[in-house]
Every structure is written in structure tokens, then in C-alpha cells.
Amino acid sequence: MLTATPLTTTGKSLFSQHYLETRLPAQPEWLEDPQPALDAALALWRKAQLYGANWNEAQTEDEFVKPLLAALGWSYIPQAKNSRSGRINRPDYALFADEASKDAAYPFQGNDDAFYTRALAIAEAKYWGRPLSRKDSSGRDTWKTDNNPSHQMVSYLVGTRRPWGILTNGQVWRLYSRDVSSTASEYYEFDLAGLLGARGAESGERTEAFKRFWLFFRRAAFTPDSQGRSFVQRIHEGSASYAREISDKLKELVFDEVMPEIAAGFVAYRRQQMGLREETAESLAEIYHASLSLLYKLLFVLYAEARSLLPVDNPAYWEESLTFVARQVAERIDRGLSLSEATHATRQYDSLLALFSRIDQGDPSLGVPRYDGGLFNPATPANQFLARHKLSDRAVARAVDILVRDAGQPVDYGYISVRNLGSIYEGLLENVLVVDAKPLGSTADASSMLPGVAQTPGVLNVALVNDKGERKATGSFYTPDFIVEYIVGQALDPILAQRAERFAAAMDQIAVLRRKLAHTLDAGANRVLREQLARAERDALEAFLGIKVCDPAMGSGHFLVNAVDHLTDGIIQRMQAYHDSHPDTPWAWNPIQRLLERVRQEILNEMGRQGIAVDPARLDDTALLTRLVMKRCIYGVDLNPLAVELAKLSLWLHSFTVGAPLSFLDHHLRWGNSLVGADVRTVERAISQTESGQLGLFGGP
């Protein structure tokens, strides 16, 4: 059946899958008939099945892409020349609303701004079935060889200033946007070959599935309406609105229900199983930190499973996955069944800890690599607490169900960004636990302020309050995205421009030295040239990867996550621009590209040693570069140790690379005072040492 295989995918969250499934059919465009375009696509597909495997790029365009663009209603001008040298280093197609717009643009070829302003979008085509997220050396490219198509799209969107771009190899079609945090990694992807080639599909099923392609890639999807908004813009805004709605709901639910439920479960366990009848301020702080750490882990796993960063397609892992557990819990709740086999049963909690351990240590039988430390490091105080304590099945089930469902529908963690998730949890950082509605050390009756406390029958009530004893979930200091993006852009764009000049100078020197080496036979001269080449390669690497960004009050890492995206896209665009303007300098001479290849091979080798099969396509250049940027360029400090852990979580999720360890951020994101540089006790100890004749903290004796 057609529905047995996934036909549409949301690459990295350009649109919400939940929005596409539940709200797209309510759009007026859904009622339109795609059958004429589907008939044209099927006719083209029949020819592609016979000959497509041997098509080069030009043949793919002539035999499939151009006719399909026409069937989708597009008017287009192919391969508009760049004014600088006449070299084709602009996208294959400028796409226009109609023939009149196309005719109006023709006279401006060579004037990029005037020409592309008249286009609705751009498009880039590759040979039939070519990988879209990595370089290819098969020789089937007729021009623009040795390029990463997704990186080309970043460069093209920046260069043409168009808001939308289409990238295709005939089989797979991607829609990119310039108005996102990371153009390189966020796109809507549709497996057109999977749809057209599906066997046994009923006509109605195929038509409805094709509609999800047709609605997003046809000309009408990009034409502004009377309010100046296009269909794709509306869906993008609707998806973003969905993410905000879910974030706001989760923020309230986490504060009112999930955290109190978890914390109350730990307090109950301590009373019932460990005989600890009273809690101190210190022990409540320990419970709070451990509860928040557990929440972080649940969030990490839900996010990673939703994006297939953990092997949910492996049947053995799937049966152990948190997503599978959540579905079982939802079914029991919906059927009114008991959430626990016994009052004090902890099977669900034990399974969670086992899953966390597998993520930390790896498990080849489940296809899980060893991620080695970070959030799942068993040596941390929070994780040691979690190992010594347990939660009942009921508490785990309730907490998980609240996190994964909204009004009975699954929460789309595949779309919610780490910035949305950061906003949920940042509001928890300044709170403390209260038990039985009385803050520790206070006689004030806070019951009137605690309508949503977690109640453990016959035992206790638990809630969160701020330092004023107020129960307030929204007291975070979260900066809106548009402000963050503006500040980050203003800070980094001038630096990237300067570093691009340094990179270009180093690459020019690399090209000269490599050509000299190719013709130098003298051993001494060869050695000198290689030393010079090594220095030039270090300069090229440091030009971009030597940029240092530090947030001295990082909170949840909002600014740092945006800085990672801005740097990654900026480096991609500027490297692509250099190679476009230097066609005789191959990408294989680029030290950053060579570093990406080396990192990819190191991960694959390590996975081989662990007995884990990893598709190399999962380790695409964009993901690896994002990780390199985070590993080499990003630093942060915060006074709140919980904020440090939240920032690590945000950046781990944002740079999650299959098979790569999580511990690499530990030395870059630190707990401390960015103004003083040390806590009071350290200063007092240093002063004492100075007075006794020992070396002081800030200078010599």
C-alpha cells in the first residue's frame, strides 16, 4: 500500500509535520485538483525509469526537470550569467510568476539585483539521483563539479536575495528558505520518486500524496496573495505559530505538573523506602536538580528520536525507545487502564535508566553508539541521585504523557527547535521546591498560591516557587528570536567578512604552493614548500574556525545556538563563493573540507570498532561543520549551574551528530562569574594565601 512507506519528510524542520498532517487539509488550496500535474509527472517518470540511471545533469534537466517545472506552472530563465566573469556560478533557474515577469527580467541579465528582484524563487538541478548533501566525484556532473548542492543553495539564496529556493535531483525535491536560522540544514523534502514509483497504490491515495508535493513546489505556492503573503509563507508562519503554542503549553505543564510530579515522586520514595521523613533546604535543592536533570534527559531522547538521531528504525531499539513507551502509556490512559502493576512498581523508571545508560555506554545490539558522557555521565551528582532513587510507574507514565501529547495529539518534537525548548526550561532555573505548600524555613501558608501542586495522596504536596515564594512559571529572561538574530548578525557579519579575506589569501597561497610542489623534484625545496603549505593551511583553518564567540551570561544558550547557525551558514556561503570565483582551485585543497572528510572517517572508523552500522550519508558536511563550529568557536559562562546544563543540552541537541561523543562541550560552557571570575571563597582563599606570603590569585607576591 502507498501509505506503508513514508512519502514526505520534513528535512530539518522547515515545516511542522504535525501542521502538515492536521492543519494543511484545512487550507483552501487543499481543495484544488492536482491531477493534470500528476499525469504529467507520471508520464515523465515512465521515461526516467527506463533511462534516468544514465542521465547526466543536462539530460536530467531536459528530460525531467524542465517539463515538470512547466507542469507546475513555472516560467523560467535557465542559467542566468553572473556579471563578474560570465561564468555560470548562479542557480540553474530563475523562476517567475508569469511570462510577463520573465520578459521584464531578460534585459537585466548581468545585473543580479535588478534581475533576481523580478523572480519569485530560484532552482538548482542535479543529475538523476545525485546526493544533495555531499560532494560527488562520479563525473556525471556536466558543470559545477565537486560541489555540495545544499551548500550551493545557501550561497545562491544569499547571492540572489531570493526568499525561496528549490533543489532537486529529479527523484528528491527540496524547498529551502533564506528566512530561517540555518538555511543549510532546514528544508522541506519530498521523495517524488517514492511516490511515483509506489506499486499497488490506489489512484485516490496517490493523488492525495502528490498534493503534498504539488502544493509546495508549484508556481501558485510562491505567488503573493492580496495581503502580500504566499502559500509557503503562510504554512511556514503557521508551523512557527504551532511551535510557539506548544512551547507555551509545555512551559505551563512542565511547571505546574511535570516537575512537581517528578519531585513529589522522589520525595515520596525517600519517605517510604529510605525512611527520610524531613527534607532540608539542601536536600530539596538536590531533589530539584536531579528532577530537572531527568527532565533534560527525557527532552533529549524525545527530540533525538523524533529526528531519527537515535535508531528508531531499528526494531530492537524501537521496543526500548521512549517514543514506544509513550505510545503504550497513551493507550493505557485512553483505555482507562492502570498505569502500574503495583503501587510501588518502578519498571518504567528502571527502563528509563537502562536507556540512558545505553546512550552513554552504547549498545551494538540496539544500534546505539557510545555517546560517552555529557548529560548521561553516571559520575555527575544528579545522575548518582537518579541511580539511588526511583519513581513509581504512575509518576513516570504521567510525566511522559504530559510531555508527548497535546489534547490527545502527539507533540511534534521533530519541528520544535532547541530555542523553543530552551524557553520552556529557562523559566524553571530560578525556582525552588516547596513541600506540603510551605517553603522550607517559612511559616507562611502558600496554599492559596499553589492550585496546581502535585498531590501524592496521604503523603505530601509539592510545588515550585521563586525566591519571593511566588508560584510563577513565566519569570524567565528569554530574548525574542528576532532580537537575538539581529544582535548576532550585527556582531558576526563584519568578522566573517574580514575572515573571508584572510581565508581567500590563505587559499590563494595554498593553490600556488600546491602547483609548485607538483613540479618540484628537489628534496630540500620540496620540504620548504611543504612547511609553507602547512602554515597556509593552518591560516585557512583559523580564518573561520579560529573565531571565538563567548556569551558571559548564556542562560539557556539562546544566543550561542543562533551564533552557531550564523557562523555555519556564513562559513558555507563564503567558502562556496571563493570556490565559485576560483574554479581552478579544487575543494580537495580546502583545509576545512579536508578536516570534514577526516572527522567523518574517524567517526565511521570508531563506529566500526563499536560494531555499529552507520550510513555515511548521515554524516553530511553541514552536520559536521556545525559540530566543528560548536567545538572550536563557542564559549559561555553562567552563574547558575542549572543554566550551564541547559545550555549544554541546547547545544548538544543542536549539534547532535550520529556516533560523535557528547562530552566535547564540558570545557567550553562553564559555571562561574564572568564579571569577578571567581567565587567569594576562592577570592578569600587567595587573599589569605597572599597575606601568608603565598602567590596571590591576581598577581605575584
State each model region's role.
Residues Y76, S85, Y93, E99-P107, ...:
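Carboxylate/His-rich catalytic cores and anion/metal-binding grooves
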Residues M1-W55, A125-Y127, Q171, S181, ...:
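Preference for the N-terminal adenyl/adenosyl cofactor-binding alpha/beta module
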Residues L624-T626, M630-Y635, L665-E684:
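P-loop NTPase motor core
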Residues I77-S83, T183-Y188, N314-L322, A500-L545, ...:
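Flexible phosphate/Mg2+-sensing switch loops adjacent to catalytic phosphate-binding sites
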Residues M1-W164, R178-S185:
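A short, conserved, highly charged catalytic patch centered on acidic carboxylates
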Residues E57, E61, S230, R234, ...:
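Basic, amphipathic N-terminal segments
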Residues K66-P67, N147-I166, R535, V614-D620, ...:
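Metal-dependent nuclease catalytic cores in nucleic-acid-processing enzymes
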Residues R118-A119, T160-W164, G170-Q171, K631-R632, ...:
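Short glycine-/polar-rich loops that comprise or flank the Walker A/P-loop
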